[in-house]
Structures are given as C-alpha cells and as structure tokens.
A protein has these predicted regions:
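Extracellular Ig-like/FN3 beta-sandwich strand-entry sites
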Residues: 129-133, 253-257
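Short amphipathic, basic-aromatic surface patches that mediate peripheral association
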Residues: 83-87, 197-213
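Short acidic/polar inter-strand loop motif in beta-rich domains
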Residues: 141-147, 264-272
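N-terminal edge beta-strand
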Residues: 52-72, 170-186
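Aromatic sugar-binding surface patches on proteins
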Residues: 116-122, 239-247
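N-terminal secretory signal peptides
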Residues: 1-15, 22, 26-30
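Short beta-strand edge segments in extracellular beta-sheet folds
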Residues: 151-157, 275-279
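C-terminal segment of N-terminal export signals and the immediately downstream linker at the start
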Residues: 31-62
C-alpha cells in the first residue's frame, strides 16, 4: 500500500476508535444517571402510585426505606420507613403509602399520621412473593411528595398460596392485641410503641384441601388515639404478613389514655387501652 494511503488508513482507523470510545463513555454516563432522569422509577409503573403522586414531582430526599437486602423467606419480611419531619402542627407527614410491586396484590398499607405521632417512622412485616421493588411514598402537609424504593432479594418465595404463609388466628373472634409501651416516656417527646395481633391474614388467593378457595379474611384497619385524638390511622392490605405487627410513635404532654383498635374486614374488632404517664 502506498505511504499516503496507509497514513490515511491509520488516521481513519484512529478516528473510528476515538469516536467509538467517546460513544462508549457517553453511553456509560447515560446509564449512570439516576432512574428519575430516565423517567423509569418503579412507582411510575403502577396506577395506584401514579394516582397518589398526581402530577407532582417526588423527591428522594428526606425519606428512608429499609428492608433486608436478602430475605431467606418472603413470608414475613421486616420493613421500616422513616421520614424527616418535625411533626409540628404546620409541618408534618400526612400519609405514608407502601407497595410491593411484584405481589399479586401490590398494596401493603397506608399510614395516615398526625402531629400527635411526634415521629414519622413505621415498622411492620410484609409478604414478598418474589425478589421485587418495594416503594414508599410520603405525602407531606405542604403538598410535596417523597419517594423511596428498595429491591430486596427473596430466596424462598412468600407466595400467598403457601399454607405456612398464614397465621393461626381463631375463625370467629379476634384475640386481645399484644402491646409494648415505652419504659420511659418524656413529656412532649416521641415514645415508641409496638403492637401485634395474632391473625392469619387470609388473602383469598389459596385453596383448601378440597380445592375450594379460602375466603379473604384480613385485618383492614388499625387506629391509635390519644385521649380521643388520632395518632395514626392505617389502611392495611393483603400484602401485610400474617400476625400483623406495627411499631410506631406517639407524643404525650400529660397523663392520658392510648386507645388501639384493630378491625377485620368482617367487622370484628380487637381493642386495647393503655395508660400514659409522661415523666
């Protein structure tokens, strides 16, 4: 090959390599952009979550969603969501919505809060049918929305048709809730409370030994009041684990009574009344 043609060939080859490398770098930079830049956040795939956002632009700041990165059994996976907020009368979290996008029924729960909560943090246990994305949306009193997403891996499915996924609650009555009050409660400071109810949380998605569908039977509502004022009002759904468990906070200024109500979709209820004595 003549020298000039050889030089032209080398220059063309170098240009191709250079442009190719630049293209790869540009592609890598695009893939490194957060999902919001692509409009591919998981919450956008579900009608219910899009309806909550309702045209607003969610932010990922000020909200944390915590689940184990790997769960050996998806039948009962611990989940904690917390939102940065003073929980004052003019600046508080109005609602926290939880969804498991890979479940046959994605809604987990909606927790509606008031400033009486004192701290916007909820812990519960959920069923995860498979490795999937879990979404938390927080609606704030100023009209803004915050979003957090996690993708836990499940090694054994919490499939909602597995018998061992369900608890052993009575068929006709609700047991007395178990409640753990804070050991020490300072006036005006958030106090942690944990409550649990033994209940199968039947989803209506599995069959009995005769092949008949077992009717849905779930706890659909939880409510906590302090001296008649709402602390938290929760709508619970089929993706909540059996024997539902809720950890939350309340703030008391003086002695009073904390009232807890669990309500089944049959209308049956279980109640607990706890004395509150801030130190």
């Amino acid at each position: 090959m003549p020298q000039k043609r050889w030089n032209d060939h080398l220059m063309s080859r170098r240009a191709v390599l250079r442009h190719g490398a630049n293209g790869l770098l540009a592609g890598a930079a695009l893939w490194a952009l957060p999902s919001v830049a692509w409009g591919r956040q998981a919450w956008e795939r579900l009608d219910e979550t899009r309806a909550i956002v309702d045209g607003r632009t969610p932010t990922g700041r000020g909200i944390t969603l915590d689940l184990p990165s790997v769960s050996e059994d998806g039948a009962s996976v611990r989940l904690t969501v917390s939102v940065d907020s003073p929980m004052s009368s003019d600046d508080y979290v109005e609602a926290i919505h939880l969804y498991a996008l890979g479940n046959p029924s994605p809604p987990i729960a909606t927790f509606r809060l008031t400033p009486r909560a004192g701290k916007a943090e909820i812990t519960t246990r959920v069923r995860l049918n498979e490795s999937q994305t879990v979404v938390a949306l927080a609606e704030m009193s100023d009209g803004s929305v915050r979003v957090a997403e996690q993708r836990p891996r499940v090694t054994v499915s919490g499939c909602l048709i597995r018998e061992e996924t369900y608890g052993n609650g009575s068929d006709d009555t609700l047991p007395e809730p178990r409640v753990r009050m804070p050991r020490r409660l300072a006036a005006g400071e958030p106090g942690e409370i944990i409550t649990l109810l033994n209940h199968p949380m039947e989803t209506g998605l599995r069959e009995d030994a005769d092949g008949e569908t077992i009717p849905q039977r779930i706890i659909e509502r939880f409510r906590a009041e302090l001296d008649g004022e709402t602390v938290i009002d929760a709508e619970l759904a089929r993706s909540l684990a059996a024997d539902p468990y809720i950890r939350f906070y309340f703030r008391a200024e003086e002695e009073g009574e904390l009232y807890l109500l669990w309500q089944e979709d049959s209308g049956a209820t279980a109640e607990s009344r706890q004395s509150v004595s801030p130190g």
